[in-house]
Amino acid sequence: GVACRCDSDGPTVRGDSLSGTLWLTGGCPSGWHNCRGSGPFIGYCCKK
């Protein structure tokens, strides 16, 4: 999948680790949670 930035990854600055996985539809898979808060963001940033 495509990596995305979780809220816990820090501000969007070059060199940040992207610990989430992008899911476009249907929310996060079972056993995962959305690790990204509100904001202009397409899909869900999910993390185990």
UniProtKB/Swiss-Prot annotation:
<dbReference type="GO" id="GO:0042151">
    <property type="term" value="C:nematocyst"/>
</dbReference>
<feature type="disulfide bond">
    <location>
        <begin position="4"/>
        <end position="45"/>
    </location>
</feature>
<feature type="disulfide bond">
    <location>
        <begin position="28"/>
        <end position="46"/>
    </location>
</feature>
<dbReference type="Pfam" id="PF00706">
    <property type="entry name" value="Toxin_4"/>
</dbReference>
<feature type="disulfide bond">
    <location>
        <begin position="6"/>
        <end position="35"/>
    </location>
</feature>
<keyword id="KW-0166">Nematocyst</keyword>
<dbReference type="GO" id="GO:0005576">
    <property type="term" value="C:extracellular region"/>
</dbReference>
<dbReference type="GO" id="GO:0009966">
    <property type="term" value="P:regulation of signal transduction"/>
</dbReference>
<keyword id="KW-0528">Neurotoxin</keyword>
<keyword id="KW-0738">Voltage-gated sodium channel impairing toxin</keyword>
<comment type="function">
    <text>Binds to the sodium channels Nav1.1/SCN1A (EC(50)=165 nM), Nav1.5/SCN5A (EC(50)=103 nM) and Nav1.6/SCN8A (EC(50)=133 nM), thereby delaying their inactivation. Also inhibits Nav1.2/SCN2A, Nav1.3/SCN3A, and Nav1.4/SCN4A, but to a lesser extent. Inhibits Nav1.5 differently from isoforms Nav1.1 and Nav1.6. In Nav1.5 the effect consists in a right-shift of inactivation; whereas in both Nav1.1 and Nav1.6 the effect consists in an incomplete inactivation.</text>
</comment>
<dbReference type="GO" id="GO:0090729">
    <property type="term" value="F:toxin activity"/>
</dbReference>
<dbReference type="InterPro" id="IPR023355">
    <property type="entry name" value="Myo_ane_neurotoxin_sf"/>
</dbReference>
<comment type="similarity">
    <text>Belongs to the sea anemone sodium channel inhibitory toxin family. Type I subfamily.</text>
</comment>
<keyword id="KW-0872">Ion channel impairing toxin</keyword>
<keyword id="KW-0800">Toxin</keyword>
<protein>
    <recommendedName>
        <fullName>Delta-actitoxin-Bcg1b</fullName>
    </recommendedName>
</protein>
<dbReference type="GO" id="GO:0017080">
    <property type="term" value="F:sodium channel regulator activity"/>
</dbReference>
<keyword id="KW-1015">Disulfide bond</keyword>
<dbReference type="InterPro" id="IPR000693">
    <property type="entry name" value="Anenome_toxin"/>
</dbReference>
<keyword id="KW-0964">Secreted</keyword>
